[in-house]
């Protein structure tokens, strides 16, 4: 009877919670539908576009309204696509007189910031002004802000200027303590993704290539800031060594990093003066979202821009309503590319790629889908912050490849890792195993028993075949010999500017140049762009999600395991991922 009452009580509580959640979601759904029917945004004279150099930036703004609602960032995830479009519209809109950039901590990759900066430099060609102000500027935010005519800081504000560094954690010893061993398999001396689990420090090849690309990023930042602010690169490096965030704001004026110190109310007066307004007048502000709602002309033929970013997987894993992760799921992308191929209204396709790779199997399927698309219409790749390993695999099938100078690309190689916890189970936990089998390798693949030399040979042979196939795809797509490909492969990571020299990409430039090239290949004189895939509707997001219980369990694990949480999650992810991977060892952001 007691158990029965418990079950009844649990059911009642569950129904109550479900009704509350359903009500909240229903209200949000109605709000979303009402918002989607809002009138087209219009502008009035003396308007200002406001850009916030703060928060997370993805290729596209977040369409998950529930995740945005619970996000620490009040504006949700910012989209590079929407930001660039807003700057471009502001350049030609006669009512918009300038751009006001609000400083903060911008979490964007190097190529995204470079594209933003290029768009702002182009905006200034219109003769319009840009003003930047903030209580604090992260290093990346300051890099973008130096396009401004004037940069102001709060009297007690800070600029974080310290150079670029990256750390890699190595888990070999802690895994050994709990009886877990990672057996690595790879092709390519630069393919270092297995090192955190099998080594105690970075290998020399890994260190060399990492130093090259973070050094290239830093040089790009310093050269741009030097040109904008009239400060030598050597002086900027001296400032970085001083850790400017610890210095008083007055020093930053002396160093010519900023133009003055103002309080929040005073910066408004500066903007009003630029607009010719009286002190009591209001500033007409437009956000990126406002600009997105402005009507655009769609003359000519369509060039589709298809966005792919995140880990490459076979299919999208279930996420709870509060998660907002992105994946390149081969099942979905292949279907989408086939639809674009069959749409006669679309004359060319630009695939925007920002990924460090993932499943080798999924990468091969994506390569095939791009090949089929290319047979019907021109395909141009626009690389973002990264288009490496599996992401380069799919890219090499295109007609033409654009990369930013700071794009991370290449990493032509394959690796695999086998998770073996036999020592944990038998020696640490005291679990005994016995087995019955019909053949010598019937239990092959079990993580609870040690692998034989023969079994390890099977896996390495599979890795070798995948590597040869990967290289053959690159050779075919880039019109190189297998010998040439081997010279630049080995898992070596390149900056976009270096990849151009070895023919892994065709040209340096951003998304706009990629679209123009696609139109030229299709022999289209006038065009407009369409963005794909179309975002999921509210109900589709809801039906494809899980409950929020995953977040609660994850939080409890974090509290219970403490410092052991990260290695636990890493080993769990190893068990869940495809056995053969084509991905970058790690990703760095310029904060």
Features from the language model and the residues they span:
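Flexible, low-complexity junctional segments that flank or bridge functional domains
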Residues: 3-48, 59-61, 97, 122-129, ...
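Cleft-lining beta-strand/loop regions that shape enzyme active-site pockets
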Residues: 49-168, 297-424
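Conserved beta-strand termini and adjacent loop/short-helix elements that scaffold enzyme active sites
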Residues: 133-135, 185, 286-288, 382, ...
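Charged, glycine-interspersed solvent-exposed loop segments at helix/strand-loop junctions
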Residues: 172-270, 422-502, 506-507, 512-518, ...
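C-terminal long alpha-helix characteristic of the crotonase
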Residues: 227-228, 259-302, 415, 471-477, ...
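Intrinsic disorder and flexible/low-complexity segments
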Residues: 300-303, 307-343, 462, 533-591
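Active-site proximal loops enriched in glycine and acidic residues that flank catalytic Cys/His/Asp
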Residues: 307-310, 353-355, 383-385, 405-407, ...
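Short glycine/threonine-rich loop-to-helix capping motif typified by GTGT followed
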Residues: 360-365, 498-501, 541-545
């Amino acid at each position: 009877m007691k158990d029965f009452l418990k079950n009844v009580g649990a059911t009642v509580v569950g129904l109550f919670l479900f009704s509350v959640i359903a009500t909240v979601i229903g209200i949000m759904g109605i709000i979303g539908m009402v918002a989607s029917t809002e009138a087209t945004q219009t502008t009035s004279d003396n308007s200002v576009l406001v850009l916030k150099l703060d928060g997370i930036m993805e290729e596209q703004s977040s369409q998950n309204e529930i995740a945005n609602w619970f996000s620490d960032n009040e504006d949700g995830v910012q989209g590079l696509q929407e930001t660039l479009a807003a700057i471009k519209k502001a350049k030609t809109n006669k009512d918009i007189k300038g751009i006001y950039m609000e400083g903060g901590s911008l979490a964007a990759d190097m190529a995204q910031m470079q594209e933003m900066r290029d768009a702002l430099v182009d905006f200034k060609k219109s003769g319009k002004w840009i003003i930047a102000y903030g209580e604090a500027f992260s290093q990346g935010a300051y890099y973008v802000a130096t396009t401004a005519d004037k940069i102001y800081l709060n009297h007690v504000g800070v600029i974080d200027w310290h150079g670029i560094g990256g750390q890699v954690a190595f888990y070999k010893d802690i895994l050994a303590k709990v009886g877990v061993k990672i057996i690595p398999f790879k092709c390519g001396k630069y393919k270092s993704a297995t090192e955190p689990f099998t080594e105690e420090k970075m290998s020399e090849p890994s260190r060399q290539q990492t130093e090259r690309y973070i050094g290239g990023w830093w040089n790009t930042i310093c050269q741009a800031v030097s040109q904008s602010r009239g400060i030598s690169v050597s002086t900027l490096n001296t400032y970085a060594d001083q850790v400017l965030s610890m210095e008083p704001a007055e020093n930053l004026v002396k160093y010519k990093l900023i133009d003055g110190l103002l309080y929040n109310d005073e910066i408004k007066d500066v903007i009003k003066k630029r607009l010719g307004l009286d002190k009591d007048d209001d500033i007409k502000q437009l956000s990126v979202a406002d600009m997105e709602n402005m009507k655009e002309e769609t003359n000519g033929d369509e060039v589709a821009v298809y966005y792919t970013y995140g880990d490459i997987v076979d299919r999208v894993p279930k996420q709870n309503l509060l998660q907002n992760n992105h994946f390149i799921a081969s099942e979905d992308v292949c279907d989408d590319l086939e639809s674009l191929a069959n749409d006669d209204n679309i004359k060319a396709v630009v695939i925007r790629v920002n990924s460090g790779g993932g499943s080798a199997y999924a990468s091969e399927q994506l390569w095939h889908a791009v090949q089929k698309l290319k047979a019907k219409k021109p395909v141009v790749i626009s690389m973002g912050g990264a288009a490496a390993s599996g992401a380069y695999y799919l890219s090499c099938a295109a007609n033409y490849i654009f990369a930013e100078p700071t794009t991370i690309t290449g990493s032509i190689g394959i690796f695999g890792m086998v998770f073996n916890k036999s020592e944990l189970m038998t020696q640490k936990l005291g679990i005994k195993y016995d087995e019955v089998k019909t053949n010598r390798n019937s239990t092959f693949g079990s993580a609870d028993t040690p692998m034989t030399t023969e079994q390890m040979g099977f896996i390495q042979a599979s890795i070798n075949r995948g590597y040869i196939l990967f290289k053959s795809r690159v050779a075919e797509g880039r019109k190189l010999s297998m010998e040439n490909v081997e010279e630049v492969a080995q898992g070596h990571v390149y900056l976009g500017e270096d990849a151009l020299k070895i023919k892994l990409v065709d040209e340096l430039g951003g998304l706009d140049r990629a679209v123009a090239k696609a139109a030229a290949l299709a022999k289209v004189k006038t065009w407009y762009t369409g963005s794909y895939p179309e975002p999921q509707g509210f109900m589709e997001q809801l039906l494809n999600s899980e409950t929020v219980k995953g977040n609660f369990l994850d939080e409890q694990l974090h509290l219970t395991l403490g410092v052991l949480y990260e290695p636990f999650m890493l080993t769990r992810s190893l068990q869940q991922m495809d056995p053969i991977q084509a991905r970058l060892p790690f990703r760095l952001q310029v904060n």
